[in-house]
Amino acid sequence: MYTLREKLADRTGFLLGVELVSTRGSMEDRQAQLTRAFATQLVQAAAIDWVSITDNAGGNPQLSPMALGKPILYAGKEVLIHLSCKDFNRNGLESAAWELASEGFHNILALSGDYPAAGYHGRGKPVFDIDSIGLLTMLDEMNRGLSRPKLGRSEQTQAAATNFFAGAVATNFKKHENEVVPQLLKLEKKIECGARFIIGQIGFDARKSHEMLCYMQTRPKIAAERVPLIGNVYLLTAAVARFFRKRTIPGVVISDSLFAICEKNAASPDKGQKFFRELAAKQLAIFRGLGFAGGYLGGVHRIEDVESILDIERSFARDDWKQFAREIQYPVENEFYYYARNEQTGLADPDRLEPAYEASLRRRRPTKNVTLNYRVSKFVHDAVFTPGTTLNRLGQWIYKNSRDTFQGPRSLRVLEHASKATMFSCKDCGDCSLPDIAFLCPESQCAKNQRNGPCGGTRDGKCEVHDFECIWGRAYDRMKYEGHEQEMLDHAPVIQDESLRGTSSWANALLCRDHTARCPQAETNTETKTDVHASSDDGAGGAKDPVATGDAAPVQADRRVDQQLVRAGGASVEEP
């Protein structure tokens, strides 16, 4: 039996995966039993290459995907487990990854995840400790043997390497330029951080789907990787189309033109069943014709629907997909395209940018997002935090020689807190990402604290949770005006260090304790951070035995041990 990794590496066939949505309740519940029965039928279907199992889809509490996945895996079918960041912090995600590896689940779809919906006694608190980029980075490092401190010692040991085959989701089904381009840049970042396959988001525009394929094939950073792209096909019904129309599912859009067609066919005697199945089959044919690695079929809950869609697709002539590609183009009004339209095919022309977009690159103009606040902040930051400048050296000296190197001089701490709270609504996280996001705070202005590019949930440029413009769209506008928008994610993955919360981000940046700690001075002028919030009192809230808990060192560790940790690549200096 071939693994999903081997099948995608073969590149000679067109694969098919089916999404299995988990349920709320135990395996004793009727709905779980129906889902289990459907899974059994998928296992027996030779045309299905893998089964993909969701992780609390839509932010709803549901049965663990591993509970549904075990019988499928043990029956011999490949399983793709969704793993999202909304419900676990990094420790929980690492623990879940170890469990998956131990149970034989090696295929993982790394997701930031949907914002939590209503749960037990109300809405659950979102976690989003790390994002999909951070998760991919962690899984990639686990594949190489994750470094970890020995119990009670300063030296590092290496865990046994895992064998994860990690993928990610990407979307360009967005209306505005400052949504689409950051999504494409994040797609590159996901591949750079370990995504070995990409699944597109639900969408109904063949030209947009072709654009993503062209982008992956032509971008110098990722073209050589030849990462497989899998097209997303969702079986609509009249009710689902109306549900999507309300934009209840973040990132999924039904345009006016498509909705009108759905409503028209919903009035037929079969309530549009034939039309919706044909639409799904046509999308599969388009993906096959364009050269996608496979199709990802969602919205199906019966094997009869799967078989019907596949039968319809087999009935098409070899080149019918070309006409379907012209037909299935349902953008929203004034939607942005990255590439120019090829008039012969109706699809993307990878040799030409969309004319209006290309013109905007030649003559860059400021938008409302290029504010005076931004310009002043950038000027001051460059003067103080650029290594080697006079103010940078002075700042390092001041904070290094202050009584409390985590807070710095009291006057500067007051100035930092007052200015950043006023200008950026700073939450005092101590590991500041303002310079990474064009001086916009992800803690106060992003519902998911996304520090490595936007999530996929924006609606017409606005946050899926709060009704304001996405910070990554605003950051793109600022960086585009300066000609640096293509570099907005050209940095190591940002993984926030929670132990720095409540400390001075100025001190942490200047002394190389924050996520930017890869700077050359880190080894010579950094004190390794310990948990500054740990208590020295005994009892439940007190300091814990480092041997019993697995902590790298006691809170009152000798400074020489701290410096050994720095040189060993310990917690205060992230690996490249």
Give short role names for the model-derived ranges.
Residues M1-K7, A37, G113, P126-F164, ...:
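Active-site pocket-lining/capping segments in soluble small-molecule metabolic enzymes
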Residues N60-K70, R90-G92, Y115-L135, S147, ...:
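Active-site-adjacent beta->alpha loops and helix N-cap segments on the catalytic face
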Residues V414-N525:
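Metallocofactor- and cofactor-centric catalytic cores in central/energy metabolism, strongly enriched
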